[in-house]
């Protein structure tokens, strides 16, 4: 494979849609092996399946350290290493900063 990211391994969180999906597709097009790290199994599998054999879906909740540790372990086990990380995942909610608790801030 040729391209600017040939034989590189990229993990993209929130890669099941929007900007994360665009990153996954762009890096894949440039030769990267891509880990689609996504909490939504349906959209994550869709993107990884469309990208093909150089892509891997791993169900990942970035708000849970055990989940991100497990995702990283699967990525390294499958591809041998991680070269690039795109922290794209986001959460949505109707909150005001003044009303956030320490638990809310830890989750963010």
Pin down the residues of each PLM region.
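Rossmann-fold scaffold of SDR-type NAD(P)-dependent oxidoreductases
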Residues: 13, 82-90
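The beta1-alpha1 cofactor-binding region of Rossmann-like NAD(H)/NADP(H)-dependent oxidoreductases
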Residues: 41-42, 59-72, 102
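Conserved mid-core segment of classical short-chain dehydrogenase/reductases
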Residues: 91-107
């Amino acid at each position: 494979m040729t391209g600017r990211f040939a034989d590189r391994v990229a993990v993209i969180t929130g890669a099941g849609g929007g900007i994360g999906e665009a990153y996954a597709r762009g890096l894949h097009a440039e030769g990267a092996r891509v880990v689609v790290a996504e909490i939504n199994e349906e959209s994550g599998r869709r993107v990884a399946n469309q990208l093909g054999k150089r892509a891997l879906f791993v169900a990942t909740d970035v708000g849970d350290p055990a989940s991100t540790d497990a995702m990283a372990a699967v990525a390294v086990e499958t591809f041998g290493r991680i070269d690039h990380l795109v922290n794209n995942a986001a959460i949505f909610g109707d909150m005001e900063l003044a009303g956030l608790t320490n638990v809310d801030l830890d989750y963010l």
